[in-house]
Amino acid sequence: MIRIRFGMDVLLVLLLATCLLSPAHGTPLEWDFAVTLRTKIQFMDSSWQTIATAAHEFDELSAITFDESEELIYFNDMRHQNGSIFSLKRDLVAANHVVEQRIARTGNESVGGLAYDPLTMNLFWSDIEQRKIFFAPIDGSAAPKVLVDLSAEGGRPDGVAVDVCRRKLYWTNSNVTHPTVERINLDGNNRTVIINSTIDMPRGIVVDQLSDRLFWIDDLKGVFFAIESSKLDGSDRLVVLKDKHHEPLNLAVTNDAIYWTDRTTRSVWSHPKVPVIRVTTTSKPVEEDSTDSTDFKDPEPVNEDCPLVRVANLSEEVRGIVVRTGFYQRLQKDHHCASIVRKVKERVDAQNTKFEVRSLQDQKMKILQDERCMNHGEYKPATDLCICPTGFKGSRCEIRECHNYCVHGTCQMSESAYPKCYCQPGFTGERCEVSVCAGLCLNGGHCRASKDEKEAPSCECPAKFGGARCEQNSTEICTLFCRLLKHEPEMYVPFGCHSICEELAQDNSTNIAVPQYQHLEVCLTPKVWTSSVIIILVIGIVSSLLLVAVIVHGIRRLYKPKRPRIRKTFVVRKQARTNSAGDTPLTNRPLATEQCEITIENCCNMNICETPCFDPKLVEQTLSKSSCKEDKKILIHNMEDDLY
C-alpha cells in the first residue's frame, strides 16, 4: 500500500508539473515571427503583435536563423568583443532568456547571412569583409572552416540558405560587376552557378521547402527592387514583386506569403507568393502588314489584388527575419525530407534522455521542490522559505515581476533585480503608461513623436492653423485684423493675412478691408545690389590691389641684384729723370724695374668720384695757382704721364 500510494503521489505531482510547464496558447513560446533590430530581438505573433523582446545586452545585431528542432535562435552581433555568433533559448518559466556564445570572434568579421543545418548541427555564415563562407559546429568542437572562398574572383557573399533535405547550400553574390546566385553541396563539392543574368545586386535568400523553390531579393539600380523566385536548379524564374523606394535586406517565406525587412522605412512588409510577372515571357509584336490579330497576345496584367502590406512598424533599423513554418510536422511524408526529419528527431530524443532523473530519490526530491517552490525556486527546509530566481517573487515564487508591469513597452529585469520598462516610441513613464502626445495637439493637429528620446514631440498642424500645439487659428485672427482695418486704415496687419483678407473681401467687401503694403515688391524680391554692398565691394577690390602691389615691391627689393664692384687700375711707366731739389719721399719714390700698377677699388662707394683725390705735396706747391687747367693736372687720374 505504501508503494502504491507513493506511486500515485508521484504520478499526481508529475501531472501537475506537466500542466504547469505545458505552454498554452498566447504564451511567449507561441511566437510566429522574430526580427533582429539594432539592439534587440523582437518576437511577434501571427497578427504581428509584439510578444516579447530579448538580447538587449547587444549593440549591433544583424543576421538571424532559427532551429525549429530545439527552439534555438542563432544571431550575430558585429560589435561584441569576444563572440561573433550567439544562441538564444527562450523558456516559458525562465525570467531571462539564456544566451550562449557559439562562435568566437577572430577579427573584424562582417556577417552578411546566417544559416543552420539541424542534421550536422553546423552553422554556415557569409563574411562580407573576407569574401568567404564559413561553417562550424555549434558545440565548439572544431574551429571555423572555409566552405567557399570568393576573394580571388572578387565575389561578395551576402545571403545564405541551407537546403536541409537535399544537403545543399545556396548563397547570393552581390558583386555589382558580376552578381550571381550559386549553390554547393554541404561537403564542399559540386559548386554551380544557377543565376547569372538579368540580376543587379542579390541580397537575402531563402529555401522554401514546402514549394521546393528559391526566393531572393534583388536590389535593382536606382530606387527599384525586386523579389524573384525559381526552382532549386535556377529554372522557371519568376518575378514575384517589383517596386521602389525600399532597401530590403532579408526575407522569410510562409505557406502563402513573403515577408522582408526594409531599412528605409524601418518596417516589415508582406506580399503574396503568387507571382504576377514571368521574366522569360515576351509578347510577339504585330507586323505592319499583318491583318490577323490572333497571333498577338497581350502581356499578363499585373494582379491589382496583391498590394504591398506593411505588417509592422519598428522603432529601430530592422535587419534579419525568421518565421516558424512547422517544417518538421509538415514534411514527415515528403520523399526528399522524410529521412532527414526522422534522423533529426532521433538525435533530439537521444539528447533529451541525458537529462532524465536517474534515481528515484532524486526524482522525489525534485518533485517536492517543484511542488513547494515554483519557477525553479530554491527551497530551504531549515527556514521553510523559497529563494526565488531573478524576476519572480512571492512565498512560492509564483508571481512574475514583469507580468503586466509595462503598459506600452517591454519588461526586462535590470542588473539590480528590478523590473525595467523599455517603452515603445511615443510613450514614457516608469511603466510606459503616459503617452507623449496625450492632449498635445489641438484643432486636429497630428502629433509626431521623435525617434530620439531627447527631442520633444511636435505637432503637424492642418491648413490655417499654427503654433507649437496648433492652438492659433490664423483665419480667425486675420478676420479680426481685416475687420479692424476697415475702421482704422493705418493699423498694422500681419503680412500673412493678406491672402485671407482677399478671400473674405470677395464675400463681404463692406466689412472687410484688404491691407495694401507699400513696399510689397521689396519684401517679396529684395534688391541684392545695395549701396552698402557696392561700397564694401569697391573697398575690398582696392585693398586687394594695394596688397598685391606691396607684395610685388617687396619681392623686387628682395631679389634686386647687388651693385657691381668697381676696380680701376693705373699703370705708371718708368721714366728717367734727375733728382731735383724739390723731390720728397712722396714724389720721388723708388722706381720698379719696368712699371708700377695702382689699383683703386670701389671708388664710387668711397665717394672718391664725387671728391677727387689730390696729392698733398703738389697741392701745397700749387696753392697759389688759380688756373683750372693746372688743377686738372694734379688729379690722380690725370697724372699717368705727367708726374714723372
Swiss-Prot record:
Q: Where is the EGF-like domain?
A: 398-430, 433-471
Instruction: Report which gene this protein is encoded by.
Output: cue
Keywords from UniProt, A to Z, are: Cell membrane, Differentiation, Disulfide bond, EGF-like domain, Glycoprotein, Membrane, Oogenesis, Repeat, Signal, Spermatogenesis, Transmembrane, Transmembrane helix
Q: Name one GO molecular function term.
A: calcium ion binding
Q: Which PANTHER family match?
A: PROTEIN CUEBALL, VITELLOGENIN RECEPTOR-LIKE PROTEIN-RELATED-RELATED
Cytoplasmic side, ranges: 553-644
Q: What is the lineage of its organism?
A: Eukaryota, Metazoa, Ecdysozoa, Arthropoda, Hexapoda
List the GO terms this entry assigns under cellular component, sorted alphabetically: plasma membrane
Where, by residue number, does the polypeptide cross the bilayer? 532-552
| Protein name (record) | Protein cueball
Where does the source fall among the domains of life?
Eukaryota
Q: Which Gene3D superfamilies has this protein been placed in?
A: Laminin, TolB, C-terminal domain
Disulfide bond entries: 402-411, 406-421, 437-447, 441-459, 461-470
Listed GO biological process terms: canonical Wnt signaling pathway; oogenesis; spermatogenesis
Cross-referenced SMART domains: EGF (SM00181), EGF_CA (SM00179), LY (SM00135)
